[in-house]
């Protein structure tokens, strides 16, 4: 048994912040949470880890990022989506045919994720089976848990980055057969997006998802040019989402990145089927796609999480993704003359942490029975404030100001992976 002491801050529900000053998390030997206490229990036979006045918070969850785009952070930010893909993305991803290169990049990515406080991910790899397995291995070694997908892509790629339909099927099965060795990083089916996959491949993936009980991730309604392209490719689909639905890919736990231009009918279809939005504000602004209607999605009962969308987004640290999401919501607030309420810090943190943990079967906040996923934030080097700060004020400053060095300890799946 272990006991973690510090200022406990969590977001058990949207807009709600729960604070236990100088509290304690009591952990079972397997790293699951036994209880939340206001003080160390008397006669407790446990190792006490005292983090002093630091903040102990549930870790971050990145629900959408492209691992092979990590080398191209900050490149092509003046280009619209399709031009950016053709100019930079496909060429960069093609390099991951080289397993040695993949190992170098993915080892760094895994380290950067965990030391930034992200312990769970829903991640795209490239179409390369061997590189995808290397990615899963490096994430698991670093302590990052979650889902990783080998990309499927049998049309509209580039000469160096495209499979045939049969290659895509064969390599997907080879990848899935090799995934059994991983304990905390699991496979998720990943058709890149409708323009990249033929109807035959999409339908095959839908059947595979049903047969093996696999989740699905892809992209939806990111920008207007993409939506128009889908209409050309799928003239029998009245809306973008139907191209996934007819293939059996539109279902509970499907993660759709962006949803910037999803109209009322598309949002309704998402809610009815349990489809999850991964909101990627930084990427949507960088590539001039727009600003997703997050408040509307939440008000209508949709499931919303946050993603860095590396490398459309240029920020891996999820606290920066949270603050970018808050700023984006303020753009919509101003454009709507105040009718569209902006996200508060508590709400942004919930979306970037608790909502993601809930996707993976956990809960918002520190809940008995959950394996601990937490970060310890030492904010002692922040500029001295003019008055003593409450834990709530310190939490807000941490979300806006903390850097990797402020995260002095990380707990993932019950284990202390950074200390």
Task: Please annotate each region the language model reported.
Residues 130-259:
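Metal-coordinating catalytic core of metallo-dependent amide/deamination hydrolases
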Residues 13, 371-419:
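C-terminal cap of metal-dependent C-N hydrolases
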Residues 1-43, 55:
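N-terminal metal-binding scaffold of metallo-dependent hydrolase/deaminase domains
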Residues 25, 31, 53, 64, ...:
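Divalent metal-coordination and catalytic microenvironments
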Residues 246-253, 295-383:
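His/Asp/Glu-enriched, well-ordered alpha-helical/loop segment
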Residues 73-144, 168-181:
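Alpha-helical scaffold segments that flank or form the walls of functional sites
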Residues 71-104, 150, 155-165, 223-251, ...:
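Active-site gating loops and adjacent loop-to-helix segments of metal-dependent hydrolytic enzymes
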């Amino acid at each position: 048994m272990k006991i973690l002491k510090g200022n406990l801050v969590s977001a058990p529900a949207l807009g709600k912040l729960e604070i236990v000053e100088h509290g304690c998390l009591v952990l079972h030997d397997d790293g699951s949470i036994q209880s939340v206490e206001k003080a160390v229990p008397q006669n407790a036979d446990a190792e006490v880890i005292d983090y002093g006045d630091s903040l102990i918070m549930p870790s971050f969850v990145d629900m959408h990022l492209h691992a092979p785009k990590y080398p191209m952070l900050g490149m092509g930010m003046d280009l619209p989506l399709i031009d950016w893909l053709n100019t930079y993305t496909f060429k960069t991803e093609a390099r991951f045919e080289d397993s040695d290169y993949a190992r170098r990049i993915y080892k760094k990515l895994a380290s950067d994720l965990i030391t930034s406080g992200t312990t769970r991910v829903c991640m795209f790899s490239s179409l390369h089976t061997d590189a995808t397995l290397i990615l899963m291995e490096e994430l698991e070694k670093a302590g990052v848990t979650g889902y990783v997908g080998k990309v499927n892509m049998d049309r509209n790629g580039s000469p160096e980055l495209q499979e045939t339909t049969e290659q895509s099927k064969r390599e997907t099965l080879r990848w899935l057969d090799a995934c059994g060795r991983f304990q905390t990083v699991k496979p998720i089916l990943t058709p890149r997006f409708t323009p990249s996959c033929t109807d035959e491949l999409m339908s095959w993936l839908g059947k595979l998802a049903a047969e093996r009980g696999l989740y699905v991730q892809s992209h939806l309604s990111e920008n207007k040019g993409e939506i128009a392209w889908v209409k050309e490719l799928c003239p029998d689909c009245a809306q973008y989402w139907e191209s996934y639905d007819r293939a059996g890919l539109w279902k509970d736990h499907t993660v759709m990145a962006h949803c910037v231009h999803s109209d009322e009918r598309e949002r309704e279809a998402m809610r009815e089927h349990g489809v999850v939005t991964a909101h990627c504000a930084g990427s949507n602004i960088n590539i001039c796609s727009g600003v997703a209607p997050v408040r509307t999605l939440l008000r209508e009962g949709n499931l919303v999480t946050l993603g860095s969308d590396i490398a459309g987004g240029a920020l891996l640290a999820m606290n920066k993704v949270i603050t970018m999401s808050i700023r984006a919501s303020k753009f919509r607030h101003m454009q709507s003359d105040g009718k569209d309420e902006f996200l508060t810090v508590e709400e942004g943190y919930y979306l970037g942490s608790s909502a993601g943990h809930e996707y993976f079967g956990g809960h918002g906040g520190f809940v008995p029975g959950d394996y601990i996923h937490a970060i310890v934030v030492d904010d002692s080097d922040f500029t001295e404030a003019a008055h003593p700060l409450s834990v709530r004020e310190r939490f807000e400053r941490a979300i806006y100001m903390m850097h990797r060095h402020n995260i002095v300890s990380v707990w993932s799946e019950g284990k202390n992976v950074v200390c």
